Design a protein with these regions (language model features):
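Proteolytic maturation boundary segments
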Residues: 28-72, 258-329, 335-343, 347, ...
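M16 family metallopeptidases and their MPP-like homologs
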Residues: 71-73, 78-97, 101-105, 120-169, ...
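Metal-associated gating/positioning segment near the N- to mid-region
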Residues: 109-117
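Non-catalytic, conformational "gating/processing" segments within enzyme and secreted inhibitor domains
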Residues: 173, 178, 185-186, 199, ...
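Short secondary-structure capping/junction motifs at helix and strand boundaries
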Residues: 174-182, 198, 650-658
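Alpha-helical scaffold elements lining the catalytic groove of polysaccharide deacetylases
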Residues: 228-232, 236, 702-705, 710, ...
Length: 963
């Protein structure tokens, strides 16, 4: 039951450890009746056949006579759409020594020709039905599985049957044409080059340290480049015949369709599949070796400073039963307490680390055990290590308190209860992913109600002694094994780490001190008011409301997601009001919400609001500052009180700002370790002609930044002008009026907003470059990036023209994918897109970028010139336009069935009625575009003499040597 264990770790984490720390996830009673007779046998039965947990009866589970499993579930969120997943029970662990990387390579070849689909046609065939390459048509290979993913824009017979046909071709009809294989080698090499970053190299070293002598450490999915470049066709065919077989396959279909019909369509497509070749062997993963305290250092510039401490044991593949889930819940409650304590330490003045987390996890069936992950600034490893070790030992020695246990039970119960309430409107793709995970882990796909029932049975009468025993057991086994990643050398090396760990284990620890319980103090904001005006926009299901103090409320009740309400409060003028000649530390805007309230610290807030679904996230936009949260109907009034409290009484405590100042330079160094990261950091400023409102400051400017500067700018801006509130989701108009009238509507009337200055409205795209702008990254010398952009227009005035340009960018994406990836094999993922500002007049651009070796940059720029010349000189075919347009339209339709789309698009509608027109015309504008329109905007904007170019190459003459 691997997936449940991993999900528990995520669900109870009390602190968000910075991405990249910890073990990496690498990827590329009653049971429903089986609805088909079974002659062939799958390699793994459905999880419910080995469990007392009932599977979700909304899912039809079955097995074809040839052994292929299938799971079919009707779900109408979003309506008329579906998701198909074809999974194979084989990944990189199943490769022989001469096949390293071929499981992943084979996944790529599924898009490169089969017996009944010519090479290059599969993607186009799906695009003609509205499936975009990458977004709706994708695949991945991990250590233990390979999966193909199709997201269907509708469930017409043509779309469903074509999609099933494509997957059926993948199952047994791939050709592995020698020329196609050779062409794809460059794409795989390009993918390896793109993914070859310090974090991945650290992960490989970590796996080797944790699992010595086991297969896992030598089977990363990307594989061996020498094999990728030279593997003969026979090796591909050998793996394909051994592991792409019906008894190793699972077909998953979720969506808005008739289950009987979908089952018949799956049977029609796959029942004739037979693979007479011998089944491939399951991988022998190797044994966990007995070990004592050990330390390993991975040192490389650009890697995150972190320490992972594990206590490892042999992996036990227990069936997914109620008893096993209860065991996992109990252990996770204890880990949640430890994570909460870590969170408190990270929020203190001069904290010992940036973040820390604890959990229990397995490493791809190879080992399992308790773990600690600590992230800190370079050079601060010793204090971080000591604090984490001693806090973990404090938990083991003294255990959790009753108050701590009750809080974590409340937190988990709240999450599970909310999931039950929204179960009927879960997203189709999320359900397909959950079924895929269940199939991979051989778990039971149970209902949220069943999950809650098991949890409640687990915590009924649960004692701290039981939790403490589970935690102590989690932190036993081989080790502790400490893996340290560092961008700078550590004096004394591994011996110093080991000595510090052993010395820390000798330091006595005291019992924990539990904070006093607080109450929510923000319930009154003045005299509640009623609206002074109300207008309905019937066709959009939206109501515009004004209050006497000038508050403007927009409400759109929806049935997209049960028990979900999204709220945004906007005020001030955002970037429009910032100076363009000096940086204001808006990069530390998280200090607003993390600083808590005048009457409650952030930690006290979390304690008071335990059991409630509310949030308060602060953001800086182009023309406003915003506070936002996600809630449910029963907590809606509290959500509005929380946002009003943050609006009227933010504490601006200094610790969160200081934490950003201390950690940001190191984080930026990590981002600069790749060409894409370095360009992302530099581009916002460069593409704004050096305007200091955009882009990031220097390390010296970060060191000199003051909280008072940020506070003054934000406070003065949001203190004047109207407050705009947008509420979307499972809410009524009356409930929204009352909650806003009691909070923001009760605030004093506000002075008029100061109009933005001409300088504030000015954002200028840079002039054309005679030679590409040079940008340096800190990664390996074989990585580079080329970028070309052309100025276009904003989305303030001619919205239809802006949408035509966005469609031009989609056509450009098709062209560069076909030319740079498919024909040349020069890059893994070339990209093209368009952006147009809704705030800054005349600001917008189209761009193309690709990561290639540095010696290929000149050729890349030539290819981009050739592609854009073709778009200017010759009108595109209707087929190509439709392939670009259909995916755009279907993506938009999908978005229009989500609350987030409306939350973003309804901003400003009180004062800008043209926004309402733009919403109404979003699809029709795209549908009206002709090939001539695409050529016209290409000629207008993709001008050679207007292009801005950049090249990103390594500052290092050679690749750094990892130690």
């Amino acid at each position: 039951m691997r997936s449940f264990r991993r999900l528990l770790l995520v669900a109870v984490s009390g602190v968000a450890v910075i991405a990249g720390a910890g073990l990496p996830a690498v990827a590329f009673a009653q049971t429903p009746a089986v609805s088909a007779s079974v002659d062939g046998q799958p390699t793994d039965p459905w999880g419910q056949t080995l469990s007392d947990i009932p599977a979700d009866t909304a899912v039809r589970f079955g097995v074809l006579p040839n052994g292929m499993k299938y799971a079919i579930m009707r779900n109408a969120t979003p309506p008329s759409q579906a998701a198909l997943r074809l999974r194979f029970d084989a990944g990189s662990l199943s490769e022989t020594d001469s096949q390293k990387g071929l499981a992943h390579f084979l996944e790529h070849m599924a898009f490169n020709g089969s017996n009944n689909i010519p090479e290059g046609e599969m993607t186009k065939r799906l695009e003609r039905l509205g499936l975009s390459f990458g977004g709706d048509t994708n695949a991945f290979t991990s250590f233990d599985q390979t999966a193909y993913l199709l997201n269907l824009p509708n469930t017409s017979d043509e779309v469903v049957e074509t999609s099933l046909f494509v997957l059926r071709e993948t199952a047994s009809e791939l050709l592995f044409d020698a020329a196609a294989v050779d062409a794809e080698r460059g794409v795989i090499v390009g993918e390896e080059r793109t993914r070859d970053v310090p974090g991945l190299r650290a992960a490989k070293a970590q796996f080797g340290f944790l699992a010595p002598g086991q297969r896992l450490a030598d089977r990363f999915p990307i594989g061996d480049l020498n094999i990728i470049r030279t593997a003969p066709r026979d090796e591909f065919v050998d793996f394909y015949r051994k592991y792409y077989r019906p008894e190793r396959a699972t077909m998953i279909a979720v969506g808005d369709f008739d289950i009987d019909k979908m089952e018949a369509q799956i049977k029609a497509a796959f029942s004739n599949w037979d693979n007479p070749a011998p089944d491939g062997p399951d991988p022998v993963l190797g044994e966990v070796q007995p070990r004592q305290t050990e330390t390993r250092i991975f040192q490389e510039p650009g890697v995150q400073s972190s320490t992972e401490i594990l206590w490892t044991k042999p992996f036990v593949d227990a069936p997914d039963t109620s008893a096993e889930r209860a065991k996992g819940w109990v252990r996770s409650l204890g880990m949640a307490v430890l994570n909460r304590r870590f969170s408190e330490l990270a929020r203190a003045e001069n904290p010992p680390f940036l973040g820390a987390g604890a959990g229990y996890q397995d490493l791809v069936n190879s080992l399992e055990g308790g773990s600690l992950t600590v992230v800190y600034n370079p050079g601060e490893w010793k204090r971080a290590l000591e604090t984490a070790e001693q806090e973990q030992r404090r938990l083991v020695q003294y255990g959790v308190t009753q108050a701590e246990l009750e809080r974590e039970i409340t937190e988990l119960r709240t999450g599970l209860t909310a999931t039950v309430a929204s179960a009927a409107t879960r997203q189709t793709t999320a359900l397909a992913g959950a079924l895929l995970n269940a199939a991979n882990a051989n778990d039971v796909f149970s209902t949220p109600a069943t999950d809650l029932q098991i949890f409640e049975a687990t915590v009924a009468g649960l004692t701290v002694e039981t939790v403490n025993a589970a935690v102590r057991d989690a932190f036993t086994g081989n080790g502790p094994l400490a893996f340290v990643s560092t961008p700078v050398p550590i004096e004394g090396g591994e011996a110093a780490i080991t000595a510090a760990l052993e010395a820390s284990r000798q330091v006595p620890v005291a019992a924990p001190v539990v904070a006093a319980t607080m109450e929510w103090p923000y319930t009154s904001f003045g005299t509640p008011t009623q609206p002074s005006g109300q207008t309905e926009i019937a066709d959009l299901g939206t109501t515009l409301i004004t209050f006497p103090n000038g508050v403007k409320l927009t409400v759109k009740p929806t049935a997209f997601t049960d028990e979900q309400i999204l709220v945004t409060v906007r005020a001030g003028n955002g970037q429009l009001g910032l100076p363009s000649n000096r940086p204001v530390p808006t990069y530390a805007s998280s200090a607003y919400s993390e600083g808590g309230l005048g009457k409650l610290t952030r930690s006290q807030l979390e304690q008071v609001l335990a059991g409630d679904v509310v949030g308060a996230n602060f953001g800086v936009g182009g023309d406003s500052y915003s506070l936002g949260g996600t809630t449910r109907p029963e907590d809606f009034e509290l959500q509005m009180q929380l946002l009003a409290a943050y609006f009227t009484d933010p504490a601006w405590r200094p610790e969160p700002f200081a934490l950003v100042k201390s950690s940001l330079p190191t984080q930026l160094d990590q981002v600069r370790a790749t060409p894409g990261g370095a360009f992302a950091l530099a581009s916002a400023g460069l593409l704004s002609s050096g305007d200091r409102r955009f882009g990031l400051p220097s390390n010296e400017e970060i060191a000199a930044a003051e909280l008072s500067d940020l506070r003054q700018v934000v406070t003065s801006s949001i203190s004047e002008g109207p407050i705009e509130i947008i509420i979307v989701g499972d809410v009524t108009i009356d409930a929204a009026i009352k909650a806003v009238g009691d909070t923001f509507g009760a605030l004093p009337a506000r002075s008029p907003a100061t109009p933005p200055s001409a300088e504030g409205l000015r954002r200028v795209f840079p002039g054309p470059t005679a030679e590409p702008v040079e940008i340096k990254h800190n990664g390996i010398a074989t990585q580079a990036l080329g970028y070309v952009a052309w100025p276009t227009l904003d989305s303030i005035g001619d919205r239809k023209e802006a949408r035509t340009v966005s469609l031009l960018a989609r056509v450009l994406q098709l062209r560069v994918t076909d030319e740079i990836r498919e024909k040349q094999g020069a890059a893994y993922s070339p990209g093209a897109s368009a952006t147009s500002s809704t705030v800054f007049p005349d600001y917008g651009y189209v761009f193309v970028q690709a990561e290639v070796p540095p010696e290929a940059l000149s050729g890349l720029f030539e290819t981009i010139d050739s592609v854009t010349t073709g778009l200017r000189d010759t009108a595109i075919e209707v087929d190509e336009l439709n392939r670009a347009r259909l995916s755009a339209v279907e993506s938009l339709r999908r978005s229009q069935n989500q609350n987030g789309y409306w939350l973003g698009n309804l901003t400003g509608v009180h004062d800008k009625p043209e926004e309402i027109v733009a919403i109404r015309n979003a699809i029709s504008d795209l549908e009206a575009v002709t090939p001539a329109d695409i050529q016209r905007v290409a000629q207008a904007y993709l001008k050679p003499d207007a292009a801005w170019r950049a090249r990103v190459t390594s500052a290092n003459p050679a690749a750094p040597a990892a130690q």
